[in-house]
Amino acid sequence: MRVLYADLEREWRGGQSQALLTLVGLRERGHEVELLAARDSALANRVSEAGITVHQASQFGLRAWAAGAMRSLIARRRFELVHLNEPHALTAAWLGRTHTRLPLLLSRRIGFPLQKNAVSQARYRAVERFIANSKDVAQSLIDSGIAAERISIVNEGVEIFPLRTPEQRSSARKRWGVRENEFLFGCVSVFVPEKGQRHLVEALPLVRALHPEVRLLLAGDGACRAELQALTRHLGQTEAVFFPGFVKDIAQVYAALDAFAFPSEFEGLGTALQAAMAAGLPSISTTRGALGEVVDGERTALAVGPNGKEFAVAMLRLINDGALRKNLSEAGRREVEQRFSAGCMVENTIHVYEDVLQKTRKG
């Protein structure tokens, strides 16, 4: 297959990670793939480093420029379909009337209702197939008026690496200045209100009153960073919390941790949680949004509500129960290997492509 993939986001978040995994996986399986992306965006740079052709759209008038670029690419190259990774790319495709030439597929990763204004509805009508990352997101599309036959579910996936060695753990902890006898919880997520990192900061005084050796690493950046740092100071936990900012080599974070905590109040499928489970980390998570499709409480991860007290109780359970940590570590990794690997995600994406092309040709 010949696929044009489009993503106009400038920042690197979970959706862009999935785009990179998809593009690389498609190429490894013999498919021809190219990317249309914002100039000098994190995704454009990483995909280019992977040896895949990238067409970079100017940052000025991004969507209009991308619309023209998409028209030109489709006229010059024999693409069979266009996979849009986020809403800006959909706008560009719609402006360029790409849907009149090729089938459009749109990835959908969050359960917000679709916008009801006339322009938004016109854009959504141009989509041949919505690719929802979970049952929860698929239901939100149906609730917004999208017919079920226009929706396919492809769970997001993560790479499965060998478990860390003791030497890798020790090296990663030295990077963050964590002692061997300290118990390190961590979270990887953008700093916005709905990600809920404040619940972990609020849990920390309760946990450290009994276990002063506990520390917390909050990897990421965003609008709530200053607020979280202020809360940390207010609760007297400054020395116990690391704020390293955005970490490109995120494997170094997972390698350093003893356990992972994911306090999101509104989430798609939670690839950061999947990656932590794949790394063999015993995990605690809410079940908001689609997280309930990943977290099987007491088996693959501890399920709690989004508040500091519940996280504190679960954190203390993990600290005090080595057998529980071992069971969650093994079951969580096994769950990701079987259901949420990058390989599964790519194969299921290919099945959707084939189904769309088959039905388009029949039509």
Model-predicted regions and their roles:
Residues 163-178, 333:
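A short helix/loop element that forms part of the nucleotide-sugar donor recognition site in Leloir-type
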Residues 98, 104-133:
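A conserved, positively charged/aromatic
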Residues 36-37, 282-285, 295:
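Short hydrophobic beta-strand element within catalytic cores of glycosyltransferases
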Residues 297-309, 317-322:
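Conserved acidic donor-binding segment of nucleotide-sugar-dependent glycosyltransferases
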Residues 127-152, 158-160:
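A short, active-site helix/loop in glycosyltransferases that binds the activated sugar's phosphate group
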Residues 13-24, 183, 187-209, 223-230, ...:
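A conserved mid-protein helix/loop that constitutes part of the nucleotide-sugar donor-binding site
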Residues 246, 265:
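Aromatic "clamp/platform" in nucleotide-sugar-dependent glycosyltransferases that forms part
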Residues 229-245:
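Nucleotide-activated donor-binding/catalytic signature segment of Leloir-type glycosyltransferases, i.e.
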